[in-house]
Amino acid sequence: MSYTEQLQRVVRNYEAAGNQLPATAHDIALWAIENGLWEPQRSTLVDRCAEEIARAMREEFITDPQGRRVRVKHVATIEKNGKQAAFWADMRQAPREHMATAFQQRRQQIVGDCRQLKWDMDSYNQNHNIGEPIQMVFDFTLDLEEIEALAAIA
């Protein structure tokens, strides 16, 4: 059983113990720890620390010379010695290759998010929506132009 499946079982146990959803993940985690269903392993603590460091890097912004608020640290998943790892770099010193990879991977994440949104919307429209189908436009060209036009006059 994978770690994710173990955690899903914890949620089922939470419900089976008479706790109802909706609930926060924090409440479920507290219940799991209090009931001895989850203990942090050293690797879990290292992973948690790494996630928090990554979040902090993801949230570091500067204002560039043109006045744009831009993210400073960028991650690219790269294979080295037969293993994939996420490497972070500061865009002010990063090699062009790293930045090109990071930007392309972020674009692919956006495409994946759009695909999932479309599937969710289509499923809702086909299986649960009793009204007019919810429509979504996935061409962001006009959105980007509008945002940039507003920024230019601000």
Language model feature labels by segment:
Residues A32-R42, I53-R58:
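Short alpha-helix boundary/capping elements
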Residues M1-V10, L45-A154:
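Phospho-regulated, low-complexity intrinsically disordered regions of nuclear gene-regulatory
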Residues A16, I33-E34, W38, I147-A154:
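Structured catalytic/translocation cores of nucleotide/phosphate-coupled proteins
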